[in-house]
Swiss-Prot record:
Family, similarity comment: Belongs to the ninE family.
Other noteworthy facts: Encoded by the cryptic lambdoid prophage DLP12.
Domain of life: Bacteria
Name of the protein in question: Prophage NinE homolog
Length: 56
């Protein structure tokens, strides 16, 4: 059985679980492709979504 001092030194007492973001940030390569859309339409769509997300 470990003494309390050894447990403190090993970090078992003050160990805090890593906080996770609620929504992981999407990388551009992970965005689902929209077939039949031109690049400018897709840009407008994602800019609109980003603007809505930042205000809400």
């Amino acid at each position: 059985m470990a003494t309390p001092l050894i447990r403190v030194m090993n970090g078992h007492i003050y160990r805090v679980p890593n906080r996770r973001k609620r929504k992981p940030e999407l990388k551009p390569s992970e965005i689902p492709t929209l077939l039949g859309y031109t690049a400018s339409l897709v840009d407008k769509k994602w800019l609109r979504l980003a603007a809505r997300r930042s205000h809400g």
